Amino acid sequence: MFRYAIARGKAKSDPAQPLVGAIPSAKGKNFPSITDPASVAGMLRAFDEFHGTFIVQCALKLAPMLFARPGELRKAEWSDIDLDRAEWRYVVSKTKNDHLVPLPRQAVETLRELHAPTGAGRYVFPGTGSAKTMSGNTINAALRRLGYDTKTEITGHGFRAMARTILDEVLQVRPDLIEHQLAHAVKDPNGRAYHRTAHLPERKKMMQQWADYLDKLKAGADVIPLHGSAA
C-alpha cells in the first residue's frame, strides 16, 4: 500500500521499511523475489504510477510479464520481435541456445506503444547518451525509487522466481512448460534438448494466462487458481 502511495507522490517513505529482512528469507534463493499475490498486485499498481521515463515504465511492465533474464530484456532488438506473430526470438546469453518467447496480447500492446519512441533504432530499450542499451541497473534503480529494497525484497531477476512460483503453485502449470519458458535446460525423454518451438501452443496459452492473471491481480480481483488450464 505504501509503495503505491510513494509511486503516486502521496507518501515519501514506507514506515514498514525498517522491518524488511526481520524475517529470514528462504535459503537457496539467489535473488529476492515477491511471490505473494497480494504483494504482486500492489507492485503492479505501483508500476502503472511510475513517474520515470516512459521507456523505463514499459520495461517495468514487461519484466514480470515476460520473465526473461534482465540482460536479455534490456538488450532486446526490434529485429528479433515480430509483433504480428506475437513472438520474440533471441539467443540465450547463458546457454547460447535459440529461444522463443510467445508474446501475450498485453505485451504486444505495450511494445506497439514503445515502438513509437524507439522503433527507429536497433534496441527496444535504448540507453541515454552514448550507451547502446538501457543500463543493467535501470530496473533495480526504478524499483528502489518505488520504495523496494533490491537486496531483500525484489530485483529485476526476481521476476523469474515470481513467475515460476505462482505459475506452479497458484496456476498449477506444468513444470516443464515453465522451465522451458525460463530458457532453462530442459531435455526430452531421450535426453536431447528441446527445440525452441517445443510445446509452443501450450506455452502461448501459458503466457496469455499469466498476463491475464497479472491484470486481474492489479485490478484487485480475488483471482481463483485456474487448475490445469495450461497443462
Regions found by a protein language model. Give the residues of each.
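Alpha-helical scaffold segments in carbohydrate-active enzymes
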Residues: 1-7, 65-69, 169-170, 209
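Short, Lys/Arg-enriched alpha-helical recognition elements, typified by the DNA-recognition helix
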Residues: 1-4, 18-20, 144
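Surface-exposed helix-capping loop/turn segments at secondary-structure junctions
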Residues: 5-14, 150, 216-224
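Basic, Lys/Arg- and aromatic-enriched nucleic-acid-binding interface segment
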Residues: 7, 11-75, 84, 94-97, ...
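Short, basic (Lys/Arg/His-rich) helix/loop patches that form interaction surfaces
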Residues: 45-57, 66, 101, 109-130, ...
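Well-ordered beta-strand positions in beta-sheet-rich domains
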Residues: 87, 98-102
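C-terminal secondary-structure termini that scaffold catalytic or DNA-interacting sites
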Residues: 105, 109, 113-121, 126-133, ...
